[in-house]
Amino acid sequence: MAIELNVGRKVTVTVPGSSANLGPGFDTLGLALSVYDTVEVEIIPSGLEVEVFGEGQGEVPLDGSHLVVKAIRAGLKAADAEVPGLRVVCHNNIPQSRGLGSSAAAAVAGVAAANGLADFPLTQEQIVQLSSAFEGHPDNAAASVLGGAVVSWTNLSIDGKSQPQYAAVPLEVQDNIRATALVPNFHASTEAVRRVLPTEVTHIDARFNVSRVAVMIVALQQRPDLLWEGTRDRLHQPYRAEVLPITSEWVNRLRNRGYAAYLSGAGPTAMVLSTEPIPDKVLEDARESGIKVLELEVAGPVKVEVNQP
């Protein structure tokens, strides 16, 4: 029998955004970034109240179909807990549908909030599993849960009847690695951008990406001079360039100047990993073309603060 939690219990969740793929690590590599959403969740006597401020305000639903609410309910179910009602207030800073893990952050925030309300019965592994299930891949969600860089993977059942199993392990990241996000002023649909990908690739391209993922792991951990080589890719970015021409142009411009630039997630954000600041002139050119520039650091894991009634 599920435990009913006390009215008045409240948690505040701070969850980082993330960048997925990092070039070659399609649906595998992720990196938590220092742009954050904050979600306040309180148990109330009845009903559901949802407020959203910042990114997504006026665009996302304010009912039970809101992703944070759905994730809270999934987390409560996994924790074998019930609540009579919920008040959910979202303060969003992660750009929505821009390739910075906004939907994964929402799922992580919801599951983490439920875990805090229920006095933390869920493990990190369970939170990765529950939040990744909303995405269908674990790279963004795992980065937001664990912080830093992650290697993630998915196990599918042979018969296709069981739910996919998601897992991840953290990677140490050199302290001097920073991220610069060039965020265009338009949304990209992950589904639409995935539709342009081929169903099969050549063995030589697969081999190319396997080697670059290995290089990228070494670059993050101990050899940041290899970041440019480690962000090369043949599995998804060449195909997505046709539907994201502005992003592709910026990635190519930056890479031609020696910067480790890549398409962040499904885009449209172009991300640069470096140990030195990007020159002001380059960033000013981006801003003048209508691109928002975010100078970021590698972030830690999701944080949950419990406020007792």
Swiss-Prot record:
| Positions contributing to ATP binding | 95-105
Q: Name one GO biological process term.
A: threonine biosynthetic process
What Enzyme Commission number(s) apply to this enzyme? Answer: 2.7.1.39
Q: Name one Pfam family in it.
A: GHMP_kinases_N
Asked if the record carries the keyword Amino-acid biosynthesis, the reply is yes
The organism's place on the tree of life at top rank: Bacteria
Asked whether the UniProt record includes Ligase among its keywords, one would answer: no
Subcellular locations according to the entry: Cytoplasm
Q: Under which pathway is this protein filed? A: Amino-acid biosynthesis; L-threonine biosynthesis; L-threonine from L-aspartate: step 4/5
Q: What catalytic reaction does the record list?
A: L-homoserine + ATP = O-phospho-L-homoserine + ADP + H(+)
Q: Which GO terms describe its cellular component?
A: cytoplasm
Q: Which GO terms describe its molecular function?
A: ATP binding; homoserine kinase activity
PROSITE patterns in UniProt: GHMP_KINASES_ATP
- Gene3D superfamilies recorded for this chain? 3.30.230.10, GHMP kinase, C-terminal domain
Q: Which UniProt keywords apply?
A: Amino-acid biosynthesis, ATP-binding, Cytoplasm, Kinase, Nucleotide-binding, Threonine biosynthesis, Transferase
Q: Which InterPro entries match?
A: GHMP_kinase_C_dom (IPR013750), GHMP_kinase_C_sf (IPR036554), GHMP_kinase_N_dom (IPR006204), GHMP_knse_ATP-bd_CS (IPR006203), Homoserine_kinase (IPR000870), Ribosomal_Su5_D2-typ_SF (IPR020568), Ribsml_uS5_D2-typ_fold_subgr (IPR014721)
Q: What is its main location?
A: cytoplasm
Intrachain S-S bonds: none
What the protein does?
Catalyzes the ATP-dependent phosphorylation of L-homoserine to L-homoserine phosphate.
* NCBIfam families, sorted: thrB
Family per record:
Belongs to the GHMP kinase family. Homoserine kinase subfamily.
Name by which UniProt lists this protein: Homoserine kinase
